Amino acid sequence: ARKVGRLLFLSGVGPRAANQKEIPGVELDVNGKIKSYDIEKQCHSVFKNVRYILEDAGSSWDNIVDVQVFLTNMKDDFSTYNKIYAEYFKNNQPCRTTIEIKALPTPIAIELKIISTI
């Protein structure tokens, strides 16, 4: 995260659990390629990671003003992700952009970029 004035910028936040190599909801083959994944588990994990980073930097979930979401499979994953997103953002509804991309640098299906106030 990077603080600029009263803003906090988070980028490249994925579902990997802190200080672990394991990615919740991802099964890899022997070559490290995604064999299967559970977008629901990844969504919950990425939101947990965002909350941790925000609080560690002196912000909070309710201070999020903008969310960019990168999904690797919009067709199959958007409805599940959107349902979970709505659960997390009941009281605070920031601006949001959801983009499908071909791949992410690690074997994950979702990554977030966040702007929050402090």
Residue ranges of predicted features:
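Short, polar/acidic, helix-capping and beta-turn segments at strand->helix junctions
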Residues: 1-118
